[in-house]
Amino acid sequence: MPVADTSQHISGVAERYASSLFELALEEGAVPAVTADLDRFQAMLDDSGDLKRFISSPVFSAEEQVGAVQALATKAGFGAYFTNFLKVVAKNRRLFALPGMVKAFRIIAAQHRGEVSAEITSAHALTKAQENELKAALKGVTGKDVAIAVTVDPSILGGLIVKVGSRQIDTSLRTKLSTLKLALKEVG
């Protein structure tokens, strides 16, 4: 099953790698395992500034990158498919595109399940109950099940930014304050 057209915000490199990983995982019946590994990797990436710097640094040779991702995968207990995927990405010097690959994989997997992907940005972490309410509300709007990816960004101060496909709803306090500031400038 060829998969395409995930998003305009994902690079072609990231989409091609993610599509290849998804198709392999689908053929091997390993989509849930690979998804779990991707989620754990994303959590590691979110928590570690060193890991972020490593994947974005052109200073390391391909051999050093392969060795480092092998050690990371072994320590994290990633499955064989995801470990081999990381090694191929490192060998081809594409580690910088890993965040986009994770995002593209999630979108492709959601499309395969007949879901719509939504990116939620919140000033604070959402509870499971809030996530479920949000999913239900978005399902009412889209008519499809919704897979959400929540990002915490304290700079929005409050509220949410919701992106579904090419649509965005910005109810953040930062945006409301900016709008108010512009309105006051026009009056004064």
Swiss-Prot record:
Q: Which family does it belong to?
A: Belongs to the ATPase delta chain family.
* Keywords assigned: ATP synthesis, Cell inner membrane, Cell membrane, CF(1), Hydrogen ion transport, Ion transport, Membrane, Transport
Highest taxon of the lineage: Bacteria
The entry's localization annotation reads: Cell inner membrane
Species of origin reads Rhizobium rhizogenes (strain K84 / ATCC BAA-868)
Instruction: Read off the lineage from the record.
Output: Bacteria, Pseudomonadati, Pseudomonadota, Alphaproteobacteria, Hyphomicrobiales
Write out the GO cellular component annotations. Answer: plasma membrane; proton-transporting ATP synthase complex
How does it associate, per the subunit comment?
F-type ATPases have 2 components, F(1) - the catalytic core - and F(0) - the membrane proton channel. F(1) has five subunits: alpha(3), beta(3), gamma(1), delta(1), epsilon(1). F(0) has three main subunits: a(1), b(2) and c(10-14). The alpha and beta chains form an alternating ring which encloses part of the gamma chain. F(1) is attached to F(0) by a central stalk formed by the gamma and epsilon chains, while a peripheral stalk is formed by the delta and b chains.
GO MF terms held by the record: proton-transporting ATP synthase activity, rotational mechanism
What membrane topology does the annotation report for this chain?
Answer: Peripheral membrane protein
Sorted alphabetically, which Gene3D superfamilies does this protein's record hold? N-terminal domain of the delta subunit of the F1F0-ATP synthase
InterPro entries, sorted: ATP_synth_OSCP/delta_N_sf, ATPase_OSCP/d_CS, ATPase_OSCP/dsu
Q: Identify the Pfam families for this entry.
A: OSCP
- Gene name, Swiss-Prot/TrEMBL: atpH
Quote the function comment for this protein. F(1)F(0) ATP synthase produces ATP from ADP in the presence of a proton or sodium gradient. F-type ATPases consist of two structural domains, F(1) containing the extramembraneous catalytic core and F(0) containing the membrane proton channel, linked together by a central stalk and a peripheral stalk. During catalysis, ATP synthesis in the catalytic domain of F(1) is coupled via a rotary mechanism of the central stalk subunits to proton translocation. This protein is part of the stalk that links CF(0) to CF(1). It either transmits conformational changes from CF(0) to CF(1) or is implicated in proton conduction.
Q: What is this protein called?
A: ATP synthase subunit delta
